[in-house]
């Protein structure tokens, strides 16, 4: 079962995880992707962090998501951070919000790079037997 950017939007993460755990068979896998409130981008940017939006009712870090899942019989297999591909144009646009002296990147704007700001967790958990 997979949940990508859902748990931070629900009224009750406990109920959400409970419902997921009830539907999993023993040994079944739950995958959750959610912002990581312990990330460096949050620590540096605080309320300007791109994931700090009103639609996110709850935030988690590796410890709190581990505790929540354990309360419902789920054991963490791994927690990873994920990245994405971003164009030079997007990167410069995002950085330009905080740094006004960035150079012009004409001709390079469509180049893409893999970036990982370490602020999104991908959690793999298994239901206990």
Feature annotation, model-predicted:
Residues 56:
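Conserved glycine-rich, hydrophobic/aromatic-active-site segments
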Residues 1-44, 59-74, 119-127:
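Conserved SAM-binding loop
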Residues 45-53, 92-99:
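Short glycine/proline- and charge-enriched loop/turn segments
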Residues 27-30, 47-50, 111:
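Homeobox/homeodomain signature
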Residues 78-129:
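A C-terminal cap/extension of S-adenosyl-L-methionine-dependent methyltransferases
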């Amino acid at each position: 079962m997979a949940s990508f950017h859902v748990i931070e939007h629900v009224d009750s993460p406990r109920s959400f995880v409970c419902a997921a755990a009830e539907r999993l068979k023993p040994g079944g896998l739950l995958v959750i992707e959610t912002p990581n409130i312990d990330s460096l981008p949050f620590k540096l940017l605080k309320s300007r962090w791109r994931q700090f939006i009103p639609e996110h009712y709850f935030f988690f870090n590796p410890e709190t998501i581990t505790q929540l899942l354990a309360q419902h019989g789920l054991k963490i297999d791994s927690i990873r951070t994920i990245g994405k591909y971003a164009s030079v144009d997007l990167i410069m646009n995002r950085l330009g919000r905080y740094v006004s002296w960035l150079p012009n990147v004409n001709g390079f704007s469509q180049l893409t790079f893999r970036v990982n700001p370490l602020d999104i967790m991908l959690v793999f958990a298994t239901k206990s037997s």
